[in-house]
């Protein structure tokens, strides 16, 4: 019989084994690629489902003027950031895997579209945190009219439904389904954008007006998430009328502070 001599276990041998193993792994990934869209789709759906629940809780908080629910909605809104970061991370990984795949054209467009949608959703999440913080403060310190409570609640409910549609628009398996849900969210937001005017919504306090303004920002973010340009999204917003509160600041009076002076001057 033949006795084989043991292979010396030196650094070169281990490096060679690693190179060979990596080459075979790369070849297997290239020839039999896994669908890179699976994880980002699931993450996007989970993110938007959680976002929809935040809007729904906010809707209940302002409708029933419940500070505890408003504060909880703020905490839940803050908890969206880790979900977004995980979704964004999976998307970046998926795009990298897709570049190494021989049939990358199949997934490239969908992943690029998802990246644009997530960028707009990120802005909406940030604006929603501000909205919920202001809403909790408003409920704690100011009593809004019943009409204002109901109209704000209805708007938040619409955002909740739109968030669910956006989630389906990113996670549905076919292009036709994704387009359907994106258009559904867009049409809902365009309709809502035409109603977000303080006077129309029964708002008569400065605090209530600030909530309406924040809603307008989130609606624009969601319209951009469906693929609309920023210019087109802003264009469908109902124009704002004059301030309805007596104590609202005049936007034409801008205080300018000179660094070398103690007093400030107001320029009209």
Predicted features, each with a name:
Residues 1-76:
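A transmembrane helix-and-boundary motif of multi-pass membrane transporters/channels
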Residues 35, 39-42, 61, 68, ...:
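Primarily heptad-repeat coiled-coil rod domains in cytosolic scaffolding/tethering proteins
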Residues 27-28, 87, 124:
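Hydrophobic residues within the alpha-helical transmembrane core of Major Facilitator Superfamily
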Residues 32-34, 92-110, 139-142:
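Conserved catalytic-core motifs characterized by acidic clusters
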Residues 78-92:
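Short, charge-rich amphipathic alpha-helical segments embedded
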Residues 113-268:
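Soluble C-terminal extramembrane regulatory/interaction domains of multi-pass membrane proteins
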